[in-house]
Structure formats: structure tokens, C-alpha cells
Amino acid sequence: TSTVFSDGQR
């Protein structure tokens, strides 16, 4: 879930 959040915030 950390990857999706980071990619979405980027």
C-alpha cells in the first residue's frame, strides 16, 4: 500500500 500511495502522491 506504500507504493500506491507514493505513486499517487507523485
UniProtKB/Swiss-Prot annotation:
Q: Which domain of life is it from?
A: Eukaryota
Which body tissues produce this protein?
Nacreous layer of shell.
Q: What is this protein called?
A: Uncharacterized protein SMPP13
Q: Which organism is it from?
A: Nautilus macromphalus (Bellybutton nautilus)
